[in-house]
Amino acid sequence: RAQLEAVRTRLPPIRPEGLPGDTPEVKSTLAPPMEAVSRVIVKGESPLGYGDWNRGTSNGIPLNKAVDGKTVADNNIVELTHEEHLARSVPSIKADDPQKLFAIGRYQIIPETAIDAFKFLGYSKKQKYTPEVQDNMFKYLLMGKRKPLYDYIKDEKGSDKGKAVLEMAKEFASIGVPYDVQVTVNKRDANNKIVRDANGKPVKEKVTRKKGDSYYGQP
């Protein structure tokens, strides 16, 4: 929350030394207020910056980037197209397949969010995830998807810090919730597998995320 409050006071546009993912050749195109928010995300989510990626989870457990006994896919994210990302993130791709891909880039965009962002921005499926495109997707997250956060950054009348942080926590797992909240999740058994009803649909239950916890339950 202190980091988000710093955004409200308009941090200078100078990027701090040693920020994960920074290189002399690749710098953010974001305006200072948005860039300040992005710093919080990069530190918690994407140490490789624009080139970062993960393979998702299996039964709620994050998958390793390295796959035992198999060659890891060449994940040059800034050269990856939107359609390639979607093709490599379909549920039918097994956890031990090195081609499997989930969240990508500086802002750890997941496939569902990427689809919405590309539609909002008018990009084609052939568009690559260049740094500028990733920055524009982040702008979509703030301006189109998480408006309470954007309103708080702009100091709009009626904006609320707690709501802003909660929106941030909903989008990025590394950000803790600002207060205790109830969320609806898939119920899991003792082996951490999703419990399903007679029709095969996941059984839902409400759980409480304590202040500072991830909205999505990761430690």
Residue ranges and their predicted role:
Residues 3-128, 133-219:
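Cell-wall polysaccharide-cleaving catalytic domain and substrate-binding groove, primarily
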